[in-house]
């Protein structure tokens, strides 16, 4: 990715609006929406400076276009910028180890790859977020309508005796399911919410 000149960039977003290449699935929204070839990775990114995805940018692929450079009044676009390693000194750091999302390809019984309306908890999180692909509105991905029935299936991939998952409890499913269920019941009181689980450890 080619980072723009962050000292010049004002974060106005015009480059993203005018970019003609808008068919790349958004990584942050888990592929539920598309982004442009020049984009801010997520709404709270620091610095709030867009980056250029070389693989999907028409300028890098064909040598033509350059729309983002033409519309940038601050002159912040730098197509010649190279990757570099920057060393900084800080008084403290936060180590966040993160996690890997379970691959649902091995769980055909849930029809995740067959039905647009079977989603993961992280995809639901993005849908329910006001800055997400549906602006916080709970919608079925198949038809855009609000669901009348919603089912959470807990413990998928946790406490598995086979090699598809992990033998231990993830320790987070219960908490975020309770959060999502309460948010949905509060915002959509006519929606029935059902939770299937092995054990509740909240």
Question: Where are the model-predicted features located?
Answer:
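Conserved small/polar residues in nucleotide/adenosyl-binding loops
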Residues: 1-3
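Iron-sulfur cluster-binding cysteine motifs and their immediate structural context
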Residues: 14-43, 58-88, 106
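Glycine-rich dinucleotide-binding loop and its adjacent helix/turn
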Residues: 32-55, 100-186
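Hydrophobic anchor at the start of a short beta-strand
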Residues: 93, 181, 193
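Short internal beta-strands
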Residues: 192-199
């Amino acid at each position: 990715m080619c980072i723009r000149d962050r000292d010049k960039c004002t974060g106005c977003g015009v480059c993203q609006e005018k970019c003609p290449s808008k068919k790349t699935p958004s990584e942050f929204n888990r592929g539920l929406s598309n982004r442009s070839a020049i984009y801010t990775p997520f709404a709270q990114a620091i610095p709030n400076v867009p980056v250029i995805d070389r693989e999907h940018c028409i300028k890098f692929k064909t040598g033509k276009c350059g729309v983002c450079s033409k519309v940038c009044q601050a002159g912040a676009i730098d197509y010649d910028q190279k990757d570099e390693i920057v060393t900084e000194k800080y008084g403290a750091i936060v180590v966040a180890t993160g996690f890997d999302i379970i691959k649902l390809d091995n769980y055909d019984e849930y029809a995740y790859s067959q039905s647009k309306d079977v989603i993961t908890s992280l995809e639901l999180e993005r849908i329910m977020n006001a800055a997400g692909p549906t602006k916080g509105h709970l919608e079925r991905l198949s038809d855009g309508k609000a669901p009348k029935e919603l089912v959470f299936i807990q413990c998928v991939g946790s406490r598995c005796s086979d090699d598809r998952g992990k033998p231990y409890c993830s320790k987070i499913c219960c908490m975020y399911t309770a959060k999502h269920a309460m948010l949905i019941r509060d915002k959509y009181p006519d929606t029935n919410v059902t939770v299937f689980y092995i054990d509740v450890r909240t």
